[in-house]
Structures are given as structure tokens and as C-alpha cells.
Amino acid sequence: MNVQIKICGLTDPDRAAECFELGADAVGLVFYPPSPRFVIDDLALEICQALPKSAPKVGVFVNDTYEFIMNKAERCGITMAQLHGHESQELADRLEKAGIGVIKAFFANRSPDFKAMTEYSAQACLVECAGEKLPGGNAKAWAWRTARGISERMPLALAGGLDPENVSQAILDAMPDALDVSSGVEASPGVKDMDKVKRFIQNATQTGIDYQPRKVFS
């Protein structure tokens, strides 16, 4: 199995569908109003309806309640929640009990907080560079190699500064189970450049690196 790929911050149903045609494993929809990639419920529903029924559809949330997240799942078709704030373990447990897979985001400055990650129980953790107010799409690369210790402990989704040119090196450095890319495949915030998406997926799946990634998006 190749490393899984999530294209995050989709705002257009046709481009979301094309991402899957090109080989993406999941898409991400941002429900955080300050983000330039924020989607309202009606658009999120359109995007989810344009995708294969079995496709993982990941909602990105920041410090939202259980009720808010479940409302988006019911109204828009979200099947997983990516938590980018200070969400409690109790919230993650409630979501998973309700059938919503949880990915917990952590932020790396000089190095990731291994202790916090190993103490938090979720389907997987996502690690990207800290330093911005918005969740994801910050185009900030970091020392991906430091994440290899995480992937030895739990499923890891790698994010932060990924693009078609550096994705092969990122995989070699971190040996992640999944990749999460947003700004690195965009023409402008929220507008995906489908040529970049195609090259990103090709380069990520043709590295020739021999390891066995675990499934993060399902």
C-alpha cells in the first residue's frame, strides 16, 4: 500500500472529484470561518455529494463542540474529524463512538511533542509546523525527519510545506502513513491547481521507498 494522500481545503466540487480521479485517498473541508478555505454547509454538501460514496471526507475543526461537529457530519456528509485546537480526549472518544474517525493535529516548532501525542488516543495524529493562526495551509516546512519517531508509535499524517517538488524527500525523512497537502497544490488559497495535484500524487506514489504505511483515512 502506498502512503495515503489527503487534499485539504477544497472549495469546488468538480476539483474535489478530480482529486479522486487522480488518485487522492481523502479530501478535507475546512469549517473554520477565519480560513480562506472555509466552506459553508451547502457547499460542503455539494463537494461531498460529488465524491464516491466510500471516499473519506474529513472535516477540519478548531475548538468546536461535539454537537457542532456531529451537525456537520449529518448535514454535509463528513465521515472524519480533524481536530486542530485544544480538543479534549473526551470529545475524541465521543466522536469515535458515534462513528466519526478522529485525527488529532499537533504542531511542531523545533520538534514535535512526543509525550502529548502518545497520551492522546485517536485514529491518527497529524503533525505540521506551528506559527500561524490558521489551521493548515500555511506552507511552512519543518524538520520532517523528527516525525519518524511518531510514526513508530502511532499512525502519522504528515503536513506542513509539502509540495510536488519536496514530497519524495518528506516521505524518505518521516516515513509517514499519510500526507496532508493544501497550499502546496494551490493556484491561490482554496483554489487547487490540478496540475500540481497530479504531480504531487505521482511523486508521492512513485518514490520506490520500501515500507508499509498504515491506513489513516477510511
Curated annotation (Swiss-Prot):
Describe which pathway this protein belongs to, using the record's wording.
Amino-acid biosynthesis; L-tryptophan biosynthesis; L-tryptophan from chorismate: step 3/5
Please provide the record's keywords in A-Z order.
Amino-acid biosynthesis, Aromatic amino acid biosynthesis, Isomerase, Tryptophan biosynthesis
Whether Transport counts among this entry's keywords is: no
Q: Which CDD domains match?
A: PRAI
* Pfam families named in the record: PRAI
Q: What is the reaction catalyzed?
A: N-(5-phospho-beta-D-ribosyl)anthranilate = 1-(2-carboxyphenylamino)-1-deoxy-D-ribulose 5-phosphate
Xref: HAMAP family: PRAI
Q: Family assignment?
A: Belongs to the TrpF family.
Q: What is this protein's name?
A: N-(5'-phosphoribosyl)anthranilate isomerase
Q: Say which species the protein is native to.
A: Desulfatibacillum aliphaticivorans
**Which taxonomic lineage does the organism of this UniProt entry have?**
Bacteria, Pseudomonadati, Thermodesulfobacteriota, Desulfobacteria, Desulfobacterales
Q: What gene is it encoded by?
A: trpF
